[in-house]
Amino acid sequence: MQTKKLNHAPKTGYMFTVTVKNMGITEYLTAWQAMKDFTQQRTRETPDEIWLLEHPPVYTQGIAGKPEHLLFPSNIPVIKTDRGGQITYHGPGQIIMYLLLDLHRWQLGIRQLVRKMEGAVINLMDEYDIVANGSQDAPGVYVNGAKIASLGLKIRRGACYHGIAFNADMDLAPFVAINPCGYPGLRVTQAKELGISDNKEVLAGKLAQNFIAQLTHRIITPHGR
């Protein structure tokens, strides 16, 4: 696991440390338990963390998840989790960015945080001259109507966990077995299909950088502009 510490200041002017951890491929249940433990044990002084990782193939159902959105069974496990939202798929080649943040520290409400999460992905796509957008009806980020990133959060004790799942270079076939995020017929896409050649490690680093820029109101100028 690689760790990088970054010091950033929100609009309050105070400096806070954000620790970015690269955790490789991690079982979903292992990561979920670790997030719950971190949030339960954190204090007002605990630095915030961003975890970058991938999961082995797994379907996760949010607290609003309905069984009928799993269209047919497979050998991929289905885990009922505590994030918001419906069912989605995680697998190798999808960048998971888990956000373990003290929302009071950053003076953020849930809607503001969701907009910043969407903004991080939208700005990442802009670095590659790809137009992406969020949706008020179906949180996430879309390119030409196809979903490239899913969002999900759990708020507890004034802090959040879970985060963003960004499709980089993965097998999209398992999405056929579900109504992604509860929407029948919703198309999905990924960075590779959009002509992005940077590998997932580069994309993960840029995604984290863009999210931190959203938190701290900094502007990142895309390379080559």
Swiss-Prot record:
Enzyme class: transferase
Pfam families: LplA-B_cat
Reaction it catalyzes: octanoyl-[ACP] + L-lysyl-[protein] = N(6)-octanoyl-L-lysyl-[protein] + holo-[ACP] + H(+)
Positions contributing to substrate binding: R83, G84, G85, Q86, I87, T88, Y89, H90, S150, L151, G152, G163, I164, A165
Record-annotated active site: C181
Enzyme Commission code: 2.3.1.181
NCBIfam families the UniProt entry points to: lipB (TIGR00214), PRK14342.1 (NF010922)
Protein name as annotated: Octanoyltransferase
Species: Nitrosomonas eutropha (strain DSM 101675 / C91 / Nm57)
Gene that produces this protein: lipB
